[in-house]
Amino acid sequence: PALIEKFRQERLSIAGEVAKLSQEVQAFLSDVKTERQKQAQEQATALRXFFLQV
């Protein structure tokens, strides 16, 4: 029984770590997406201004 309880605790610990890592990955991807959208908007604005000058 002690060994089974140890395995159960380890499984819960691993599941918790996986959930935490998943949240961190999602936050990172969200930040990357936001930054890429910002860069795309800046590039579009610069391109628009370039065409207006031509």
Curated annotation (Swiss-Prot):
It is found in: Gas vesicle. Keywords: Gas vesicle. InterPro entries: Gas-vesicle_GvpC. Its main location: other. The keyword Phosphoprotein does not apply. It comes from the Bacteria. Sequence repeats lie at residues 18-50. Belongs to the gas vesicle GvpC family. This is Gas vesicle protein C.
